[in-house]
A protein has these predicted regions:
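Trp/Phe/Arg-rich N-terminal binding region typifying the photolyase-homology
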Residues: 1-186, 293, 362, 381, ...
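Glycine/tryptophan-enriched, flexible segments
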Residues: 156-313, 317-322, 453-456
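N-terminal Rossmann-like FAD-binding beta1-loop-alpha1 element of flavoenzymes
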Residues: 466-495
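Glycine-rich FAD pyrophosphate-binding loop
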Residues: 486-511
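Central helical "cap/lid" subdomain
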Residues: 502, 591-643, 688
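FAD-binding beta-loop-beta segment adjacent to the flavin cofactor pocket
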Residues: 507, 696-724
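A conserved short coil-to-beta-strand element within the FAD-binding core of flavoproteins
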Residues: 569-584
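Flavin-binding catalytic cores
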Residues: 663-701
Length: 769
């Protein structure tokens, strides 16, 4: 390899291939083909071996905080890479892990390869994945992110100025160097070759339906929705950079700290994070620019950004609390809360008592970005409402990585940890909460900021327009969808035919006045992404520690989900109609018939009720529910042996109420009995006096057949426990609700941006070769 490539490589020996068919470029963190050292290493090696090159890109479900937002950005990047690869005549194959396609695609591909060349990533799980592939074939990791390669320097420093002093000579030498042109001539791949998996055409998926149908098959977090106005890919990234280079860079030194001016910074961090643009290109352009703004931009790129990457390369477990300096950790042990503690979910939903902090959090939730100057203040905020500083740091990292398009990155790791003392010095005298760690009072920050203008963009609705959404059904799926939409800045109205929040999660009151669960006795099947929500409900006392059983009953959980929402009880929707603008609902309300228009309607009623309602709009859904009889009455003092298919549970504080549940088979046999008759049958079958007994028939207790995915047709979407998986569970209800909301934010279409991502390249003379 020429020196400018060789210095960027870390080699992992592995078994040689008995008969190699090609070289694999495993594209995972540098999603571009122009000015990409990994690509250049791969094609140089392929030429030397006389082999074709295959570019493999995988979008996995197992990366931290995998979500619709991050997946969508990655799919756009993949579409851009595929477009450029076709121009270059090189085969690019994309594997998206999803239902029916979770095979070890890369391992199988590596078995056919001579060597696997990939981007250097110092974080887990990517490091572990590198090791797994190295057991199959030799792997070469290439630094495609830094101006000064990590294999050349790769050391941390306790302060940024020390890193700057240690690297300034090399940075000065490198920052203006054009990237050498790679002139490798590659052997063509056989037209008959097929990859050991079914490749995905990302551009086709985006053009078809905004990748909605593809994302529906991925086990990822749908509650983190795609963002508007930020398209992944090298061409989109370079178009953004070209605009900023021409119009904003010269003023960067004056505008970069004004968070109210969203255009005052380049906003390039999401594309830099994914390696969709080359840091070497941006640095070279800024060096040629020669303005004071460019000088400050170079300082950010070559000191703070590079320092973070070299730090993550040098230390184990870059996220770990023990990397915070000893003086800071000792200081934190002697601090105390000033404000009342708040639940983590309140903070995630921007419900603190600080206006600036809330505005910043809403901005990253809705738009996937946060102004860096505010991020330094925001990052020091969570510890104001959490007793344990280490837990506060973990939550801050979690929020940043979950929502920010530039999260899960050495820069964001270092940025969050700086808020807790990393790369900083002590400040005395100690403060009550922050101790000796640098303070950034949000009130002071807000005072020097045009807060109204800042909130104007951070608190704007997610997506391309503010939606007016109607939701039919106020159960778990309906209320969860409503809360997500409301948190994203949309207008939402929930219509429920009952007097209060209940539905199939309803309760009753035992003879001693204690409420007990009449509807679904447990909530289960939670998707992994919902763990933080379930934990929140446990901590608030709605669910038992197992996350499945109510502490008392489940309607209080529904009431909690409906807090602050426009929920209209006793509003029965009896008709749907598509309109040119969206959808119209026909409603029977306490004040008489109504007709209400919405941009979109989510139908969240039980399956059979949804079917009948949807047919009024010409929409047909298939499915079937099972029935369940529940009866209750005074409990005897003695034990009772229940008949087959009957479950007996004593309820109430004095256990004086006996609840009887019949399984679906037993319930179906008596389905058409009247309620009073069934109460008598149950009591007498148990040998008890029927006085004081009552019964309830759940004709549609739980779906057992259904689509198991959200159904969309025009302005209508159908959600609930029949429209998710596992069918018939609370998890399915929650998952379908979140996916329907995410789908509303998936814009349809994709085209490469007109500004080319191709770098101005040169020969090796500038590198002394």
């Amino acid at each position: 390899l020429p020196s400018h490539l060789d210095e960027r490589c870390i080699r992992h020996p592995g078994p040689a291939a008995p008969s190699a068919g090609f070289v694999v470029h495993w594209m995972r963190a540098a999603l571009r083909l122009d000015e990409n050292p990994t690509f250049d290493v791969a094609r140089t090696i392929a030429e030397g071996l006389g082999l074709p090159l295959v570019i493999y890109q995988g979008i996995d479900e197992r990366y931290p905080h995998a979500s619709y937002r991050h997946h969508r950005f990655l799919l756009e990047g993949a579409a851009d890479v595929a477009h450029r690869a076709e121009e270059l005549g090189i085969r690019h194959v994309l594997h998206v892990a999803r239902d029916g396609h979770r095979e070890p695609a890369l391992l199988r591909l590596a078995e056919e390869a001579a060597v696997v060349v990939t981007d250097l990533v110092d974080l887990e799980p990517w490091s572990a994945w590198t090791g797994a592939i190295a057991k199959i074939r030799p792997v070469i990791e290439v630094d495609a992110h830094c101006v000064l390669p990590r294999p050349v320097f790769g050391r941390t420093a306790n302060r940024p100025f020390r890193f700057k002093d240690a690297t300034k000579r090399e940075m000065k030498r490198r920052m203006g160097q054009p990237w050498p042109r790679c002139t490798a001539n590659l052997e063509p791949l056989s037209p008959s070759w097929t990859p050991p998996f079914t490749p995905v055409d990302a551009a086709a998926a985006l053009r078809k339906d905004g990748a909605v149908s593809l994302l529906a098959t991925c086990r990822i977090d749908p509650s983190v929705v795609p963002v508007a106005g930020m398209t992944g890919g090298a061409s989109a990234g370079m178009a953004r950079w070209a605009s900023y280079l021409n119009e904003g860079l010269s003023r960067y030194h004056r505008t970069r700290n004004n968070a109210a001016n969203r255009g005052g910074v380049s906003g390039m961090s999401p594309w830099l994070h994914h390696g969709m643009v080359a840091a070497t290109r941006l640095v070279r352009d800024a060096a040629e620019h020669g303005t004071k703004g460019a000088e400050k931009f170079l300082d950010e790129m070559l000191v703070f950004r590079e320092h973070a990457y070299h730090h993550a390369h040098d230390v184990d477990r870059p996220y770990a609390w023990d990397h915070v300096p000893d003086w800071a950790r000792a200081s934190w042990r002697n601090t105390a809360l000033v404000h009342p503690a708040r639940p983590a979910m309140d903070l995630e939903r921007a419900q603190s008592n600080d206006v600036l902090w809330n505005a910043a959090q809403r901005g990253v939730v809705r738009h996937g970005v946060m102004h860096n100057n505010v991020r330094m203040t925001w990052g020091k905020g969570t510890v104001q409402w959490m007793e344990d500083p280490e837990a506060a740091m973990r939550l801050t990292q979690d929020l940043n990585d979950r929502y920010a398009l530039d999260g899960r990155n050495p820069n964001s790791i270092a940025g969050v940890m700086w808020c807790f003392g990393l790369f900083d010095r002590p400040f005395d005298p100690p403060e009550v909460r922050m101790g000796r760690v640098r303070r950034r009072d949000p009130r002071d920050h807000a005072a020097r900021l045009d807060l109204r203008a800042y909130r104007g963009w951070t608190e704007a609705h997610a997506g391309s327009k503010r939606l007016n959404v109607g939701i039919v059904g106020g159960g778990l799926s309906g209320r969860f969808a409503a809360r997500l939409l409301s948190d994203l800045g949309h207008e939402v109205t929930v219509y429920d035919k009952g007097r209060r929040a209940s539905g199939r999660l309803s309760d009753r009151t035992a003879s001693d006045g204690t409420p007990f669960q009449l509807g679904a006795p447990r909530v289960e099947g939670w998707p992994s992404w919902a763990e933080r929500h379930v934990q929140d409900w446990i901590e608030r006392g709605y669910l038992d520690v197992d996350g499945e059983h109510p502490v008392v009953t489940l309607p209080p959980l529904l009431d909690h989900l409906g807090e602050g929402l426009n929920v209209r009880q006793l509003h029965r929707v009896d008709g749907l109609e598509a309109t040119p603008e969206g959808a119209r609902l026909r409603i029977i309300s306490p004040n008489g018939p109504l007709e209400v228009n919405h941009d979109h309607v989510l139908v969240a009623a039980p399956l059979e009720q949804s079917r009948a309602l949807l047919e009024t709009a010409g929409i047909h859904v298939e499915g079937r529910s099972e029935a369940c009889w529940v009866a209750w009455g005074p409990a005897p003092d003695h034990a009772i042996e229940p008949p087959a298919g009957w479950t007996l549970t004593r309820r109430g504080q004095d256990r004086a109420t006996l609840e009887v549940r019949l399984d679906p088979e037993q319930s179906a046999a008596d389905l058409e009995r009247s309620l009073p008759d069934m109460a008598v049958v149950v009591a007498t079958t148990l040998g008890l006096d029927p006085n004081g007994w009552a019964a309830h028939r759940w004709r549609f207790s739980r779906p057992i057949e259904g689509p198991e995915h959200v159904v969309h047709q025009g302005a209508f979407s159908v959600i609930g426990d029949a429209f998710g998986a596992p069918i018939g569970t609370a998890g399915a209800a929650l998952d379908s609700a979140a996916r329907a909301v995410a789908d509303l934010h998936c814009t349809v279409g994709w085209q490469p941006s007109e500004v080319s991502a191709r770098a101005q390249q040169t020969d090796l003379s500038a590198w002394g070769a």
